[in-house]
Amino acid sequence: MDLIKVVEQRFADLTQKAYPHFKSGDTITVAYRIKEGNKERIQQYRGVVIKMAGHGSSKRFTVRKMSENIGVERIFPINSPFIDNIVLNKIGKVRRSKLYYLRKLIGKKSRIKEKRI
């Protein structure tokens, strides 16, 4: 058996938190811990997941939000110790796994349909 895979699996078991299952197109809120000097605060980052990449302990996801008509994207590692929690707000209905086309759309065209449950 590959030694690197064994180490990654043990590391993932130690650092893995229970987050809800989400995919591209879902709207999530990430509570991210930010340290400024000797103070620490939690910032809520709400947006649409446009990409899931990697696997295992190196898995990461990209969240896009609109801030005053400017698109802001942020990449979060799934096993980051700075992520406090992740809340799934909406389940999106999309046919692609990478939603790069949202970068070109403006206004109501950039909305994603919500999946009915």
UniProtKB/Swiss-Prot annotation:
Keyword rRNA processing set for record: no
Record bears the keyword Transport: no
Record-level Gene Ontology MF annotations? structural constituent of ribosome
Cellular component (GO) terms are:
cytosolic large ribosomal subunit
Give the family this protein belongs to, as stated in its UniProt record: Belongs to the bacterial ribosomal protein bL19 family.
Q: What does this protein do?
A: This protein is located at the 30S-50S ribosomal subunit interface and may play a role in the structure and function of the aminoacyl-tRNA binding site.
Q: What is this protein called?
A: Large ribosomal subunit protein bL19
Specify the species. Azobacteroides pseudotrichonymphae genomovar. CFP2
Q: What is the lineage of its organism?
A: Bacteria, Pseudomonadati, Bacteroidota, Bacteroidia, Bacteroidales
| Gene behind this protein | rplS
